[in-house]
């Protein structure tokens, strides 16, 4: 690699000399000897400042290449790019997971809302059925209680009528007995008894 670097430096210096129209082994001082008006740049070791700057740049580039700085920089950049790409992939994965979780949550929320609506509708239906059945039961109970009350009233009325009739019959019997006792004496009773006996005897025969 050092041979190639030396060759490269020599080629660059030769190109610089040819561009200036000077021989490769001729210094700037000898070239300026042909004219008095030509400005002579200061030289060191037969090289102008521009040549030294070019040489320094070439040396720096060669050092960078020798130390593998571009490859290190490239590797660092590749590593950074890989890290950024990994972060982007992770962010994309996290976003996909978030979207999935969001979709699952929305689906569960919709299912829960639907289930709540169904439960509410079922509860309303059951409540309406219970109220309707309660009305029917209340109506039937009222009718039964009314019937029982009517039956009790009718029974009480019949009992009262029977009691009144019994009392009336007892009073009538007592009055009839008193009237008979008042109008008939023992002689008349004997005649009635004899007549009744005779009537019974005739009826047998």
UniProtKB/Swiss-Prot annotation:
Membrane-protein topology: Single-pass membrane protein
Keyword Cell inner membrane (UniProt): yes
UniProt keyword annotations, A-Z: ATP synthesis, Cell inner membrane, Cell membrane, CF(0), Hydrogen ion transport, Ion transport, Membrane, Transmembrane, Transmembrane helix, Transport
Keyword Transmembrane helix: yes
UniProt-listed Pfam families: ATP-synt_B
GO MF term set: proton-transporting ATP synthase activity, rotational mechanism; proton-transporting ATPase activity, rotational mechanism
TM region positions: 45-65
Subunit composition and interactions: F-type ATPases have 2 components, F(1) - the catalytic core - and F(0) - the membrane proton channel. F(1) has five subunits: alpha(3), beta(3), gamma(1), delta(1), epsilon(1). F(0) has three main subunits: a(1), b(2) and c(10-14). The alpha and beta chains form an alternating ring which encloses part of the gamma chain. F(1) is attached to F(0) by a central stalk formed by the gamma and epsilon chains, while a peripheral stalk is formed by the delta and b chains.
Protein name: ATP synthase subunit b
């Amino acid at each position: 690699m050092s041979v190639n670097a030396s060759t490269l430096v020599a080629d660059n210096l030769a190109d610089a000399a040819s561009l200036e129209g000077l021989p490769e082994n001729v210094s700037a001082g000898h070239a300026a000897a042909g004219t008095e008006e030509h400005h002579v740049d200061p030289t060191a070791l037969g090289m102008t400042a521009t040549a030294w700057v070019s040489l320094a740049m070439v040396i720096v580039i060669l050092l960078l290449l020798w130390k593998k700085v571009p490859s290190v920089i490239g590797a660092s950049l590749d590593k950074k790019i890989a890290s950024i790409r990994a972060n982007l992939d992770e962010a994309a994965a996290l976003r996909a997971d978030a979207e999935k979780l969001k979709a699952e949550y929305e689906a569960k929320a919709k299912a829960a809302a639907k289930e709540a609506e169904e439960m509410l509708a079922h509860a309303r239906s059951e409540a309406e059925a219970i109220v309707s059945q309660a009305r029917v039961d209340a109506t039937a109970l009222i009718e039964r209680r009314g019937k029982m009350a009517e039956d009790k009233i009718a029974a009480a009325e019949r009992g009262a009528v029977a009691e009144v009739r019994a009392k009336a019959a007892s009073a009538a019997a007592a009055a009839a007995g008193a009237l008979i006792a008042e109008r008939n004496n023992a002689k008349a009773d004997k005649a009635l008894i004899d007549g009744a006996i005779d009537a019974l005897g005739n009826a047998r025969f």
